[in-house]
């Protein structure tokens, strides 16, 4: 099987289970694995008014532990990991799985797509906050080592982040092999320092009893509700377990969770709780104060490495979601570079990378500390949790055929928990929660504007197109001069004559001896099997209609797709094949459709979209692009 036939995520499945578990530690668990850096510090932030008492500390640790057990272990590891879409996970895969189950109800199908698109848009907000809060919280450990380094925390954070984003264009294939071993050292360190500190206040193990979590909520009332907005930070990154399922498979992710990550996180949170019971003043930075003074600089270095790895996973996820959104028709084409010759899933999108870096630096410099950023973190995460739980209902009911009542009960249980966390984080909108919401809302608005604009453009082109059948019949009545070679006309409308063909005939008065009308369609599925990639329909006068199908995670390569026509008797010689593309120049006009300013935004996106020839891997010296003005 060639590289183009192999789905990018499935090549890892041939590796031994132990290596897959190690790789999963380095990719999947970076985000949730670095949460202990800031969760306890945020919960007991003086601004929240929660006192560092024994009952509160044990109650909070109990709340954190059971939140991890219910949200991560039960919802994601046990339930949602079963919802694989051709082996793939993530919100786009869950969206396509849920929406494909209600295709007979177009209105509901469209609503689900909008909900899923908003969830994907919020992921961009997460892509900003995660690198900012993770790296900043790690570097803040220098303040614990010596207060004299406090003025250097922000500059060091900025330098680390700039270096991280500059690395993206080179790819992480070389150093990526170190991610797993580094995270193993990280999780072992988490568990070890936690265990050592538990010995100083063993009564903290009472937190395993969920009654302490309930008692904390009842006795503290409003303060407990506010604390939920910080407790939820302990499960940020939990969605990565599902998002990265296509790379590693469900079994290695489950084994890595129960065999390494969950015990390490549990011991570390218990250790922080024990430290606070023994020394309430340690709330200034309970994570780094777990370490002996001689190990602080090493701990800061290790934490920085772990947060860089966590950030790398999120950045790669943003690139992946961007490409999926492009192929599902939610975003304009962008320049996509491949950073690995062996794994086609490793991509780099320059525009997204530098835009993301700019906004991340704004977040770091604007919020100034991990405590301030924590207020901005939870809103996008809890909104995504609510969306994924909602989509899961449709999988339970219509894909797995659960009884309606059982589907409602399961969904209601998780929605009640997600909604409690969501409500608590909404309280922080004014303190910074607005930041990821604004990012997500702007991206969502761009997505629906592009999707609506493309539909308007396609509808207009269909309405003015000459029917293909009539055109072919006219070739018999008035045959043009035919020249040697093959012409391939890309068209979104398989029933109409492409504008590029009409322009070519009008100006050159010739037609190639073989003409192909090629339409690319993207399915609501991650991968399309290679045997289903193409369909060929012979037309009259040596003309053919070819449809190429891709999934939203497939790599588009039209010359390779045309090679698949050889068993059907169609051979495309590269030096005798020319590709003709139409490039629409959109002219906004008042009237029906979108508001004029949205049409202008759409026109600007069309102008700045990357070249279709480059996107579809067409040979540059065999492409002719013809423009056409279109009013919408």
Curated annotation (Swiss-Prot):
Membrane topology reported for the UniProt record: Multi-pass membrane protein
GO molecular function, one term: potassium ion transmembrane transporter activity
This protein's record includes keyword Repeat: no
TM stretches of this protein: 19-39, 57-77, 111-131, 147-167, 175-195, 213-233, 257-277, 286-306, 347-367, 376-396, 404-424, 429-449
Assigned keywords, A-Z: Cell inner membrane, Cell membrane, Ion transport, Membrane, Potassium, Potassium transport, Symport, Transmembrane, Transmembrane helix, Transport
Subcellular locations according to the entry: Cell inner membrane
Catalytic reactions on record: K(+)(in) + H(+)(in) = K(+)(out) + H(+)(out)
Keyword Transmembrane helix annotated: yes
GO CC terms: plasma membrane
Family: Belongs to the HAK/KUP transporter (TC 2.A.72) family.
Role: Transport of potassium into the cell. Likely operates as a K(+):H(+) symporter.
Protein name: Probable potassium transport system protein Kup
Natural source organism: Nitrosospira multiformis (strain ATCC 25196 / NCIMB 11849 / C 71)
Gene: kup
């Amino acid at each position: 099987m060639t590289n183009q036939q192999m789905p990018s995520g499935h090549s890892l499945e041939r590796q031994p289970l132990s290596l897959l578990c190690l790789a999963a530690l380095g990719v999947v668990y970076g985000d949730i694995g670095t949460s202990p850096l800031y969760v306890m510090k945020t919960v007991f932030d003086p601004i929240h008014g929660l006192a560092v008492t024994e009952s509160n500390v044990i109650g909070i640790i109990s709340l954190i532990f059971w939140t991890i057990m219910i949200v991560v272990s039960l919802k994601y590891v046990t339930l949602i990991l079963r919802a694989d879409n051709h082996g793939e996970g993530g919100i786009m895969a869950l969206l396509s799985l849920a929406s494909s189950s209600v295709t007979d109800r177009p209105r509901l199908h469209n609503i689900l797509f909008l909900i899923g698109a908003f969830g994907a848009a919020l992921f961009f907000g997460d892509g900003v906050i995660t690198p900012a809060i993770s790296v900043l919280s790690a570097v803040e450990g220098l303040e614990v080592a010596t207060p004299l380094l406090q003025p250097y925390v922000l500059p060091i954070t900025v330098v680390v982040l700039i270096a991280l984003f500059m690395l993206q264009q080179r790819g992480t294939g070389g150093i990526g092999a170190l991610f797993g071993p580094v995270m193993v050292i990280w999780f072992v360190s988490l568990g070890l320092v936690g265990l050592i500190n538990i010995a100083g206040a063993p009564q903290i193990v009472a937190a395993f009893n969920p009654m302490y979590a309930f008692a904390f909520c009842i006795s503290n009332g409003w303060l407990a509700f506010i604390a939920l907005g910080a407790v939820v930070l302990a499960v940020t990154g939990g969605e990565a377990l599902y998002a990265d399922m296509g790379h590693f498979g469900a079994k290695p992710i489950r084994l890595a969770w129960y065999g390494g990550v969950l015990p390490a996180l549990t011991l570390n949170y218990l250790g922080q709780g024990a430290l606070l019971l023994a020394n309430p003043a340690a709330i200034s930075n309970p994570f780094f104060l777990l370490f002996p003074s001689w190990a602080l600089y090493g701990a800061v270095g290790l934490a920085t490495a772990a947060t860089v790895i966590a950030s790398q996973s999120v950045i790669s996820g943003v690139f992946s979601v961007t490409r999926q959104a492009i192929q599902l028709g939610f975003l304009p084409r962008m320049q996509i570079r491949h950073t690995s010759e062996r794994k086609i899933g490793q991509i780099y999108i320059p525009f997204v990378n530098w835009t993301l870096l700019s906004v991340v630096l704004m977040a770091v410099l604007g919020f100034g500390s991990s405590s301030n950023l924590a207020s901005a973190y939870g809103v996008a995460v809890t909104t995504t949790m609510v969306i994924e739980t909602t989509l899961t209902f449709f999988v339970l009911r219509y894909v797995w055929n659960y009884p309606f009542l059982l589907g409602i009960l399961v969904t209601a249980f998780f929605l009640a928990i997600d909604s409690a966390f969501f409500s608590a984080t909404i309280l922080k909108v004014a303190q910074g929660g607005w930041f990821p919401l604004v990012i997500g809302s702007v991206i969502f608005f761009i997505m629906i504007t592009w999707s609506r604009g493309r539909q308007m453009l396609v509808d207009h082109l269909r309405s003015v197109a000459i029917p293909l059948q009539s055109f072919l019949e006219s070739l018999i009545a008035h045959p043009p001069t035919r020249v040697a070679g093959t012409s391939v006309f890309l068209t979104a409308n398989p029933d109409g004559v492409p504008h590029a063909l009409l322009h070519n005939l009008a100006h050159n008065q010739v037609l190639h001896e073989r003409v192909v009308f090629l339409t690319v369609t993207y399915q609501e599925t991650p991968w399309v099997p290679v045997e289903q990639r193409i369909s060929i329909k012979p037309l009259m006068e040596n003309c053919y209609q070819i449809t190429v199908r891709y999934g939203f995670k497939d790599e588009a390569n039209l010359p390779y797709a045309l090679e698949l026509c050889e068993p059907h008797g169609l051979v495309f010689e590269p030096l005798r094949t020319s590709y003709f593309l139409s490039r629409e120049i959109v002219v906004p006009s008042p009237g029906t459709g979108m508001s004029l300013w949205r049409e202008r935004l759409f026109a600007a996106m069309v102008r700045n979209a990357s070249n279709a020839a480059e996107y579809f891997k067409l040979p540059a010296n065999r492409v002719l692009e013809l423009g056409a003005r279109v009013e919408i």
